[in-house]
């Protein structure tokens, strides 16, 4: 690892392929917490137009979602960030989103951390139905066996142990590679957590759905996902994962700072 000094804790990577307006829409949500995170756009399509002096990498070919995410992970950890996060561009984030993911009250063994959201994985699904900008953070987190890659943060320690997404096994769209990464991170002894202090809205299947058609995209992505997971882990394990429930745990209250009376040296 190259230990170049950085001032932020996390590098956020957005894999982008067309639909610049989606990426532009989520930029303010990310940049609102620029005291905590830096932002990298991986331009898979070669046509991204920067609007906020954002850092853009143009690999010259379409790396796919998994490949672009892995490029972001490698870049982050070679530069010395503690965490790296991949974020879909068809998303919007609640206020304080990254503060929630980086909350030091989460267990020390965290290897993967993600938000709760309005998408379909029950392990991360929230009952909240309002505007993402009005979400009120809850002091709970969930211990889970797998996490969705829509917005997924990995620690440097976990990445050094297991690496990133498998770019070969899960087909063109990489569905299921997030489950596989979750399994490998958990097997290496790290915790997987979804925090209710962070909420994400996901439009879902936008860029890929438009490029190949939503029905065809869903069929191919789901087929490749199921085949790969069953081959790697077996039907029984995959079935158990689908039925798994989260363990909901309260976050400890922040500890009050100690006030020191400098005239006497006493604390109170």
Task: Identify what each model region corresponds to.
Residues 20, 41-51:
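A conserved acidic beta->alpha catalytic loop
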Residues 28-37:
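Short, acidic, metal-binding catalytic loop of nucleotide-sugar glycosyltransferases
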Residues 59-76:
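Glycine-rich, basic loop-to-helix element that forms the pyrophosphate-binding segment
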Residues 81-92:
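Short beta-strand-to-loop acidic/aromatic patch adjacent to the donor-nucleotide binding site
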Residues 91-126:
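Conserved donor NDP-sugar-binding/catalytic core segment of glycosyltransferases
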Residues 120, 135-154:
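A recurrent flexible, glycine/aromatic-enriched loop bordering the glycosyltransferase active site
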Residues 152-154, 158-162, 169-198:
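A short, conserved alpha-helix in the catalytic core of glycosyltransferases
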Residues 193-213:
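Active-site donor/metal-binding and catalytic loop motifs
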């Amino acid at each position: 690892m190259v230990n170049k000094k950085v001032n932020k804790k996390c590098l956020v990577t957005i894999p982008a392929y067309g639909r610049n307006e989606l990426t532009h829409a989520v930029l303010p949500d990310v940049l609102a917490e620029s005291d905590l995170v830096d932002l990298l756009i991986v331009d898979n399509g070669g046509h991204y137009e920067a609007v906020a002096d954002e850092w853009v990498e143009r690999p010259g070919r379409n790396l796919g979602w998994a490949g672009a995410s892995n490029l972001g992970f490698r870049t982050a950890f070679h530069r010395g960030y503690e965490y790296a996060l991949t974020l879909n561009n068809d998303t919007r984030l609640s206020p304080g989103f990254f503060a929630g993911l980086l909350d030091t009250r989460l267990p020390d063994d965290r290897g993967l951390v993600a938000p709760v959201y309005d998408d379909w994985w029950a392990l991360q699904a929230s009952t909240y139905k309002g505007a993402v900008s009005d979400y009120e953070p809850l002091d709970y987190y969930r211990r889970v066996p797998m996490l969705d890659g829509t917005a997924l943060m990995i620690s440097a320690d976990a990445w050094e142990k297991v690496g990133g997404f498998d770019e070969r096994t899960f087909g063109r769209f990489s569905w299921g590679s997030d489950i596989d990464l979750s399994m490998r991170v958990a097997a290496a002894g790290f915790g997987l957590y979804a925090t209710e202090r962070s909420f994400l809205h996901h439009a879902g299947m936008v860029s890929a759905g438009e490029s190949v058609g939503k029905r065809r995209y869903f069929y191919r992505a789901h087929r490749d996902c199921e085949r790969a997971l069953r081959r790697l882990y077996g039907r029984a394990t995959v079935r158990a994962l689908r039925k798994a429930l989260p363990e909901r745990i309260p976050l400890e209250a922040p500890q009050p700072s100690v006030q020191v009376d400098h005239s006497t040296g006493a604390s109170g």
